[in-house]
């Protein structure tokens, strides 16, 4: 009898464990796929670290807009702080705006504001509470870039470049896409898989 009860208990535990792992897999699978290249991204509104609301339309550049999903704590995102700041500075004069989006549930607006000041991130960083925009765009990691043309069509999606360590930099995918668009050329590589820390969703 004891042996039978033990078998039933073990079987029950296996069923529960299976349900837990299945739930975990399902949660990961709930992130929608990103829009296809060429898709139009609808306008949205998010608050900045001072709780002032900004729409995509109000911040868009006259020659295009880059959306960068960023993080306060992610070491990969932090490895790109200087490069992101330089990117925003370099392309602002060329009519391309850079907008940061923080979708991590554990990083509040105070942390976002302090982090931006510490690392001299002069571009606006919006707080995506409930990760609604991250879900809308299928963003999964930080940093992750989306480049929109003047009609808000997605023309590049993915990594900023190939290397977390700038000493190993070989391909500046995002800059190449921006330069091609500014020159009226077709972007040769419109997608390059982003890498970094997973976005911690609500």
Label each PLM-derived region with a short phrase.
Residues 2-12:
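Bacterial N-terminal signal peptides that target proteins for export
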Residues 16-24:
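C-terminal segment of classical bacterial N-terminal signal peptides
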Residues 28-57:
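N-terminal "domain-start" segment that seeds a small globular fold
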Residues 42, 64, 121-124, 139-146:
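Structural micro-motif
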Residues 57-78, 98, 178:
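Short active-site neighborhood of thiol/selenol oxidoreductases, capturing the structured segment around
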Residues 71-81, 105-106, 145, 197-200:
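Short, thiol/selenol-centered motifs that function as redox-active sites or metal-ligating centers
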Residues 78-119, 126-136:
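Structural microenvironment flanking redox-active thiols in thiol-disulfide oxidoreductases
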Residues 147-150, 154-202:
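Thiol-/selenol-based redox modules, centered on thioredoxin-like
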């Amino acid at each position: 009898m004891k042996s039978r009860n033990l078998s039933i208990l073990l079987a029950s535990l296996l069923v529960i464990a299976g349900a837990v792992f299945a739930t975990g897999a399902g949660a990961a699978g709930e992130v929608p796929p990103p829009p296809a290249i060429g898709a139009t991204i609808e306008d949205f509104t998010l608050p900045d670290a001072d709780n002032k609301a900004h729409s995509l339309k109000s911040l868009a550049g006259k020659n295009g807009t880059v959306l960068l999903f960023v993080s306060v704590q992610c070491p990969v995102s932090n490895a790109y702080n200087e490069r992101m700041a330089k990117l925003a500075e370099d392309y602002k004069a060329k009519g391309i705006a850079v907008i940061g989006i923080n979708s991590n549930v554990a990083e509040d607006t105070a942390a976002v504001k302090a982090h931006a000041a510490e690392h001299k991130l002069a571009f606006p960083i919006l707080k995506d509470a409930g990760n609604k925009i991250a879900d809308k765009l299928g963003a999964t990691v930080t940093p992750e870039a989306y480049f929109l043309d003047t009609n808000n069509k997605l023309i590049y999606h993915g990594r900023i470049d190939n290397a977390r360590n700038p000493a190993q930099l070989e391909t500046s995918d995002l800059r190449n896409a921006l330069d091609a668009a500014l020159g009226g050329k077709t972007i040769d590589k419109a997608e390059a898989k982003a890498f970094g820390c997973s976005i911690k969703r609500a």
